[in-house]
């Protein structure tokens, strides 16, 4: 995970450069303290981790988490190379772990900051064999962690029609969920991303000229269903709630948590957690009354930034 998430059909990287969305804004809100201890909860390709490490310096400690061992390998090479070439470099520890386990092994009030960039990385999207994108045909996998048992193929082929429709509606906010679920069940078995995308596209075909005019302005008809399956397979929203619940326990007073999300389901969870943490439990001071979004310049350079929203809070 990490370094941006997208529900757009392109499934491309960050303008080809792997620069994370809202990089400057995220680092500014994190307010890295030299010599501190920070957690990058979604290492991805190491873009955020690199910027944090540069500011930490040799006395500091950066802990990086990711479900995806392939992402950790890429980030590890980058960060290790920097550690060799730059003398003032912090200790870096990379762990194959979900951000839901952010508090594992951490003592209370010992962390200066937590950063989480939620969703799919370009490394995952661009690999057809991972099954995250319908832009290239591949197996219906969608697991961020290959150790997980549940795959998108199992979900698509084994949930009953009602359960499948509920998943598509709840996690994809897809208003045509029942029609799509019915088409999927009738088309079983479905083994590939291309087959699934074709089934969804046919099921979501506009019913009249007015709807057709509206649909032409929309995203690809399979986008929301693919999002729903990915979230369900990886338990993404449950993991996000676990992270937000654990963060106050491990943060020092004055420590910050910064979260970048890419769709309304995630943003709503972050917004509610920060607001409740500030008003009910009194352990957060919200730093972003409204979510921070990408500048027009960044959006022009990287269309994936258009849906990004950053929220930040400080431990009190």
What name fits each language-model region?
Residues 1-316:
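S-adenosyl-L-methionine-dependent methyltransferase catalytic core, i.e., the SAM/SAH-binding region
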């Amino acid at each position: 995970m990490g370094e941006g998430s997208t529900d757009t059909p392109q499934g491309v990287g960050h303008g080809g450069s792997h620069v994370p969305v809202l990089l400057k804004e995220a680092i500014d809100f994190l307010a890295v303290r030299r010599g501190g201890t920070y957690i990058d909860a979604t290492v991805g390709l190491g873009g955020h981790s690199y910027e944090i490490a540069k500011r930490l310096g040799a006395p500091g400690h950066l802990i990086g988490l990711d479900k995806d061992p392939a992402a950790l390998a890429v980030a590890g090479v980058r960060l290790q190379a920097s550690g060799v070439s730059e003398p003032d470099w912090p200790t870096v520890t990379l762990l194959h772990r979900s951000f839901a386990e952010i508090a594992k092994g951490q003592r209370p009030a010992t962390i200066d900051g937590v950063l989480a960039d939620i969703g799919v990385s370009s490394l995952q999207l661009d690999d057809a064999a991972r099954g995250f994108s319908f832009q290239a045909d591949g197996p219906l996998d969608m697991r961020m962690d290959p150790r997980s048992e549940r795959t998108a193929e199992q979900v698509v082929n084994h949930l009953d029609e009602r359960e499948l429709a509920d998943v598509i509606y709840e996690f994809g906010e897809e208003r045509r969920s029942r029609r799509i679920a019915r088409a999927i069940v009738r088309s079983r078995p479905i083994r590939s991303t291309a087959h699934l995308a074709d089934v969804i596209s046919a099921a979501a075909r506009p019913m009249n000229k007015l709807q057709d005019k509206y649909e032409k302005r929309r995203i690809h008809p399979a986008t929301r269903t693919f999002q729903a399956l990915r979230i369900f397979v990886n338990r993404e929203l449950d993991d996000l709630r676990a992270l937000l619940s654990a963060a106050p326990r491990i943060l020092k007073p004055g420590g910050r948590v910064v979260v970048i999300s890419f769709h309304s389901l995630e943003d709503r969870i972050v917004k509610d957690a920060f607001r409740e943490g500030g008003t009910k439990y009194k352990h957060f001071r919200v730093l972003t009354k409204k979510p921070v979004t990408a500048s027009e310049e960044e959006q022009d350079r990287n269309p994936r930034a258009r849906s990004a929203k950053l929220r930040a809070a400080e431990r009190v």
